A protein has these predicted regions:
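Cytochrome P450
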Residues: 1-408
Length: 408
């Protein structure tokens, strides 16, 4: 690629996260230039960044807004979203001082020290879920492990009582549906409304009787007027979305990738010291976010040799950037012993870097490490099966049937 070709609008389907291999599409787009015009649906064309250096630049540039409010052509839709989507009050779309204020309210829960303190509980949950199928010699690692494990950890962190966790898990699933049809828009709104109703009595309980959990800390901040009612609701829903599905996808995608690369599986099984680097490589190779994260231009914005007009949406392609051959040698090869310096971008970068990344890494490290230790002959139940992906905005496995020598 020697220049930017702006004569083509590339189609990036809404179900790109469910495609068996979306990476050739991203590479074809990148061949025309690292910043390209793409079509997300018949009525929405945006800009997409596929280069690593350009993605880092965009993720750290304060001139780009995380909020679509005020963007040309989106005013009507954004006015509706402001009224109906409580996530518009979350730090996900906040900028500047509001983002810092909201992030600081929960940052202590995700420090490395706090995560280290949580590690024994993560290990205990991991062992308990594995114990439930260890003597069978087979399991679906999505429904029996990758999904319930982060839900159990998140429930403890937030302060969800055991009796409420099944409902919590059921409601969380509705948050990941892509809003590409009226029906899914309605389901997403219903899921947010039901989750809001789910949290109301818990919030009342924590206000009356605080515990050592994140929900109590947020209620205390609300009492001090550091967070509004709507922001508190938005925070609980955002934590549910980010803390559950992202980690579940990381675990399932990671195990699937290792089982598809037996030499990498064997290397990691035989040398557990490779685990920290392996998690980073698995995030780079097959992260939970396929299409990317959105930013919005307030003024004309130059990136990668292209001037993007004011009032436009830019999709920063995290998965595409993580396989940029200009940044990574053998970018399409899984190599858990990779020694390259560039940080993978699966958790984003800059001030909006995923707050829960340390916990997600710890959960994945413990989960995958324990699986390999307890089941050294872990394998796909049917190596020739075309396994489907979970429907939603994230890239995750719908099912992952495995076999192994039963314990005991």
């Amino acid at each position: 690629m020697t220049g930017q070709d702006q004569t083509i609008v590339h189609d990036v389907p809404v179900n790109v996260a469910q495609q068996p291999n979306p990476y050739p599409l991203f590479e074809r787009i990148r061949e025309h230039g690292v910043v390209q015009r793409v079509r997300l649906n018949p009525t929405l064309e945006v800009w997409m960044v596929t280069g690593y250096d350009e993605a880092v630049a965009a993720l750290t540039d304060p001139r780009l807004s995380s909020s679509p409010v005020g963007v040309n052509g989106l005013e009507k839709e954004m006015a509706h979203q402001e009224r109906t989507n409580v996530l518009m009050a979350s730090m996900l779309v906040a900028n500047g001082e509001d983002h810092t204020r909201l992030r600081n309210l929960v940052s202590k829960a995700f420090t490395f020290r706090r995560v280290e303190q949580m590690a024994p509980r993560v290990q205990a949950h991991t062992d308990a879920f594995i114990d439930a199928f260890a003597t069978r010699g087979s399991a679906d690692l999505v429904s029996e492990f990758a999904l319930p494990l982060p839900m159990a950890v998140l429930s403890e962190l937030i302060g969800i009582p055991a009796e409420g966790q099944p409902d919590f898990a059921r409601l969380a699933v509705g948050l990941i549906m892509p809003p590409n049809t009226p029906e899914r828009l309605a389901k997403g709104a219903q899921a947010r409304a039901e989750l809001t109703e789910f949290f109301l009595p818990l919030i009342a309980q924590r206000k009356a009787d605080p515990k050592d959990d994140l929900l109590s800390a947020l209620c205390a901040a609300q009492a001090e007027e550091r967070i509004s009612d709507r922001e508190l609701t938005a925070m609980t829903i955002l934590l549910t979305l980010a803390g559950h599905e992202t980690t579940a996808s990381l675990i399932a995608n990671g195990v699937h990738a290792l089982l598809r690369h037996p030499e990498q599986f064997a290397a990691l099984r035989d040398d557990p010291s490779l685990l920290p680097g392996a998690i980073e490589e698995l995030l780079r190779y097959e992260g939970p976010v396929s299409r990317g994260v959105a930013r919005f231009t307030v003024d004309d914005y130059e990136i990668g040799g292209v001037t993007v007009p004011a009032g436009e949406m830019i999709i920063i392609g995290l998965a595409a950037a993580n396989r940029d051959p200009a940044r990574y040698d053998r970018a399409d090869i899984l190599d858990i012993a990779r020694r390259e310096v560039p940080q993978q971008l699966a958790f984003g970068h800059g001030v909006h870097f995923c707050l829960g990344a340390p916990l997600a890494r710890a959960e994945a490290r413990i989960a995958i490490g324990t699986l390999l230790r307890r089941f050294p002959d872990l394998r796909l139940a049917d190596p020739d099966a075309d396994l489907s992906r979970r429907e939603g905005i994230l890239r995750g496995m719908a099912t992952l049937p495995v076999a192994f020598t039963p314990e005991g």
